[in-house]
């Protein structure tokens, strides 16, 4: 089987983690070996970086610092988890990847896209997903969901204007890469989304 790397993207509260876990269960039932991971995080080093990035007490983190920290966590995850697992024939399911940096730091914060592309290339070694599943949701609804049961983290404290830019960035990237993007309306039911994801991924895996 070819190396299969599947990424879930979307604004906060779009249901990425839920759908990733449902897909993992579906593939496991088909006796397909999988591993689930996330960004930032997925390794001991990455999880420490995640704590720093999401801590609301560090609101002074500069944009460039933020982007480099995300890339550092990504470099560790690719080297320690993603690439070795792919080489073993494991299907890798990842909650966020490179396009999160482009959407949040590029479109959201207005950082130079070419600079972000360079550090992403260095961090990932050019490793790109076979498919990116974008769960598209109006930011108002996403933030309402994500803030429902816990305090907002540093990024969730950003303005709605910021999140609208992030969403627009995702949709623009999806238009540029139609062959590798699956864009779904995240306002659908959990079951409806799961069926569509399984259909697309099942076709990719031949199951």
Swiss-Prot record:
Keywords recorded for this protein, A-Z: ATP-binding, Kinase, Nucleotide biosynthesis, Nucleotide-binding, Transferase
GO BP: any one term: dUDP biosynthetic process
A cellular-component GO term for this protein: cytosol
Database matches in InterPro entries: P-loop_NTPase, Thymidylate_kin-like_dom, Thymidylate_kin_CS, Thymidylate_kinase
Keyword ATP-binding attributed: yes
A Pfam family the protein falls into: Thymidylate_kin
Reaction catalysis annotation: dTMP + ATP = dTDP + ADP
EC code: 2.7.4.9
GO molecular function: ATP binding; dTMP kinase activity
Main enzyme class: transferase
Keyword Nucleotide-binding belongs to the record: yes
Ranges that cross the membrane: none
Record-listed ATP binding positions: 10-17
Family assignment from sequence similarity: Belongs to the thymidylate kinase family.
Function: Phosphorylation of dTMP to form dTDP in both de novo and salvage pathways of dTTP synthesis.
Name this protein carries in UniProt: Thymidylate kinase
Lineage: Bacteria, Bacillati, Bacillota, Clostridia, Eubacteriales
Gene expressing this chain: tmk
């Amino acid at each position: 089987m070819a190396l299969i790397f599947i990424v879930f993207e979307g604004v906060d509260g779009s249901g990425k983690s839920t759908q990733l876990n449902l897909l993992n269960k579906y593939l496991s039932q088909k006796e397909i070996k999988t591993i689930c991971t996330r960004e930032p995080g997925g390794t001991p080093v990455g999880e420490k970086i995640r704590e720093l990035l999401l801590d609301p007490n560090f609101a002074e983190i500069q944009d460039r610092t933020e982007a480099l920290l995300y890339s550092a966590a990504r470099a560790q995850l690719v080297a320690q988890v993603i690439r070795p697992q792919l080489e073993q024939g494991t299907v890798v399911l990842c909650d966020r990847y490179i396009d999160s940096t482009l959407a949040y730091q590029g479109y959201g914060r207005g950082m130079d896209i070419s600079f972000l592309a360079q550090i992403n290339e260095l961090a990932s070694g050019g490793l790109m997903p076979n498919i990116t599943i974008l769960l598209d949701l109006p930011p108002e609804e996403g933030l309402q969901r994500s803030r429902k049961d816990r305090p907002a983290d540093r990024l969730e404290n950003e303005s709605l204007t910021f999140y609208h830019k992030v969403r627009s960035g995702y949709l623009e990237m999806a238009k540029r890469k139609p062959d590798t993007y699956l864009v779904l309306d995240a306002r659908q039911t959990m079951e409806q989304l799961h069926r569509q994801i399984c259909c697309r991924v099942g076709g990719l895996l031949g199951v």
